[in-house]
Amino acid sequence: MNNIFHGTEDECANEDVLSFQKISLKSPFGKKKNIFRNVQTFFKSKSKHSNVDDDLINKENLAFDKSPLLTNHRSKEIDGPSPNIKQLGHRDELDENENENDDIVLSMHFASQTLQSPTRNSSRRSLTNNRDNDLLSRIKYPGSPQRSSSFSRSRSLSRKPSMNSSSNSSRRVQRQDGKIPRSSRKSSQKFSNITQNTLNFTSASSSPLAPNSVGVKCFESCLAKTQIPYYYDDRNSNDFFPRISPETLKNILQNNMCESFYNSCRIIDCRFEYEYTGGHIINSVNIHSRDELEYEFIHKVLHSDTSNNNTLPTLLIIHCEFSSHRGPSLASHLRNCDRIINQDHYPKLFYPDILILDGGYKAVFDNFPELCYPRQYVGMNSQENLLNCEQEMDKFRRESKRFATKNNSFRKLASPSNPNFFYRDSHQSSTTMASSALSFRFEPPPKLSLNHRRVSSGSSLNSSESTGDENFFPILSKSSMSSNSNLSTSHMLLMDGLDTPSYFSFEDERGNHQQVSGDEEQDGDFTFVGSDREDLPRPARRSLFPSLETEDKK
């Protein structure tokens, strides 16, 4: 026994074979307690195998023998008989020294197989490892039916990915021929729609709004480079625009302080039309609504026929009567619209420098009336323009509640077919229509026309044929008054008040009527005469209830 385990090549072969068995099967042979528990596996009878299984085993054995990682003496020992129990007992004492070398050899063998198929996924690697473990177990235990079944099952599983790979290759061929599956067609359609929408959005957003596409240039602020003295209003926290004094305005207009830094200087008068007509700064423009402001300074710049070749920006000076509310509000709206248009060119703008005239037109008129034409001053709350002031302020308040944002002002500012292009024409037509509507002369409604039964010749009222009596009894009927289209409803209601007796003698307690001669009637006042109160007919009662009147007479 000692000659078998010492100093021969068979000893080394047996040790290597047992190490492969321990690593692949993960059997507890390393623990001495479990040695005799696994001895029964060596005495199991060999199961019957088919010829197909034997051929597969022989092929795998040949492939394993031809591996470059195995030595010649190992291949010889694998073909030998299985070791006995004593050899296993002695092998357990020598396993600890050779575990490291065997692990390295086995890992190199598995690595060589994985390198041959680098495109396999993790599931294929696990199947390959199980296949290698089953291969080693079948080499050691060729008669075990359980191991052969697991080996054949692993081979059947390992063949499925190859079938899938062949089907994938056939699909690739079909795609090259132009036959695309429906799923890929839908995905390609979605991708094309997304790309088309992005292209349309970029083209739509860049074509109307890009200043360079229409020849419009945007500029940066150069107010700090100029010699214009400006300051900010500390009393109003919402005022973000610099302010200038009336003296600075005079120097800009007369001494051309901004000629080297600005292409031109424009003064915007935000007062109402009647204020501007009463007196304004020379060469100023009257704009008192947001629509007019957008049309003059945004639409004309974007959609003008002539290209803008200016290399310098335009300086804007905005004011109202006191430059406290209307002027700063319109200046803020213009800056907001300018920022929306030039959002891709931040911080450049069409009008980077906007100044507020501190004190407004009143301060200029008080200090430098020679700058005004005509040299007059009409206030907003002037007595002769109270109605116009109230109407214009209502419009201005409604406009101030609207905020210009990117969503609600994007197409309004950029569209060339905006109705604000015709703002001035429509405004002028509306003013002419209003003036023509108010040009008629006011005439009061005609006076009441009363029909009388008997009226003297000196009376101005309509009279019927005289019967010779001096006394007369006027007949007041609503039917005669309703026939006249000039009478109003209030006059009709006035007739109801005539039903009550408006004439009686306060001297007589019974209410006898006064008797007046016909000569006294000619003085101009109506005097109703009757000997008895019942003799006077009541027109409303007679017209509404004629039957009651006849009963009363009876």
Curated annotation (Swiss-Prot):
Key words, A-Z: Cell cycle, Cell division, Hydrolase, Mitosis, Protein phosphatase
GO (cellular component) term, any one: nucleus
Cystines in this chain: none
PANTHER family per record: M-PHASE INDUCER PHOSPHATASE DUAL SPECIFICITY PHOSPHATASE CDC25, PROTEIN-TYROSINE-PHOSPHATASE
Gene, per the UniProt record: MIH1
GO biological process annotation, one example: G2/M transition of mitotic cell cycle
Region of interest (Disordered), residue spans: 72-93, 111-192, 449-469, 510-554
Top-tier EC class: hydrolase
Signal peptide: none
InterPro entries noted in UniProt: MPI_Phosphatase, Rhodanese-like_dom, Rhodanese-like_dom_sf
Domain Rhodanese: 261-373
Family from the record: Belongs to the MPI phosphatase family.
Annotated catalytic residues: C320
Catalyzed reactions: O-phospho-L-tyrosyl-[protein] + H2O = L-tyrosyl-[protein] + phosphate
Compositionally biased spans, kind Low complexity: 119-130, 138-171, 456-466
SMART domains, per database record: RHOD
The UniProt record lists the keyword Membrane: no
Protein's UniProt name: M-phase inducer phosphatase
Function: Terminates the cell cycle delay. Reverses the CDC28 phosphorylation catalyzed by SWE1.
This enzyme's EC code(s): 3.1.3.48
Record-level Gene Ontology MF annotations: protein tyrosine phosphatase activity
Entry keyword annotation includes Hydrolase: yes
